[in-house]
């Protein structure tokens, strides 16, 4: 049952729910969630109830991501939480960009450490602060397995995140090419405009190479501070649309991993404020 609830929070399901006519398979996935609430309660309240059950009985990666985002934004409300960011040869589970930026790799009790070395190497090329998030039971193993500059956060039995070891910052591990590749073209241009007054002076086909050459001439500490500024401001319109939609707190990680139009976010918000009874299905969820 709890796995069915976890499936309802996937970005694939949530994206489908934002469409004008969600497919039957998505409605079936949501049916297990809707059944948890009084039929007249909003579907969003049912998602919050389902999430509470996941926290209590099935601490999957989604739970770790959501609690990490909530805790990070409580500490720094103006920060930006990004989910599933490609970084060098890996994909960071969560990146939080505020006054500083931190890349987080989540290892639940269902995960192995087999790829951890490569993942941490990738993140360390782009972020001063890198952390691994594990259950309390895996803290000692994580402390022994990761480099000394990598922080370790523990997810305890009360669903709180505590710091077993803070990360160690510094620019020496950063790679300018990796920083450049994480940034989008508009972000690169914004950095170069602020730093050297640059505006595009070559055809679009040559702009990547031209901006790369100019970016590499920046001092690493300057480039990194600008990198953090751009990540903090990334997808600001998306975040405004998410806030306007009034999504339930339990949807934080799903929303952070999606890019939708403003209309689609509004449609999703309307759906989650509608009665749960509309999403009860007699057929069982698809496998």
Feature map (PLM): residue ranges:
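Interdomain/boundary linker segments immediately adjacent to catalytic/signaling cores
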Residues: 1-57
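Conserved catalytic cores of phosphodiester-cleaving nucleases, focusing on short active-site segments
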Residues: 94-110
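Short acidic-glycine loop/turn motifs at beta-strand connectors
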Residues: 98-100, 156-159, 168
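Catalytic cores of nucleic-acid endonucleases
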Residues: 110-150, 156
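C-terminal, charge/polar-rich interaction regions
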Residues: 218-287
